[in-house]
Swiss-Prot record:
It comes from Saccharomyces cerevisiae (strain ATCC 204508 / S288c). It holds the Pfam family Pmp3. Keywords: Cell membrane, Membrane, Transmembrane, Transmembrane helix. One of its GO terms (molecular function) is phosphatidic acid binding. It is found in: Cell membrane. The keyword Membrane applies. Plays a role in the regulation of membrane potential. Could mediate a proton leak. This is Plasma membrane proteolipid 3. The keyword Isomerase does not apply. It is a multi-pass membrane protein. Disulfide bonds: none annotated. InterPro entries: PMP3. Belongs to the UPF0057 (PMP3) family.
Amino acid sequence: MDSAKIINIILSLFLPPVAVFLARGWGTDCIVDIILTILAWFPGMLYALYIVLQD
């Protein structure tokens, strides 16, 4: 696990949309994570962790 992935994991805990943006760019995944984070922070964080760990 390199340092960029560790930083993305930490970002996914505190700023989930930023972590998804860095992992996948601006697209459907980022929009879904923004919506999940606005509705409730915890689902947005879990989705961001899923995206970051999947790559």
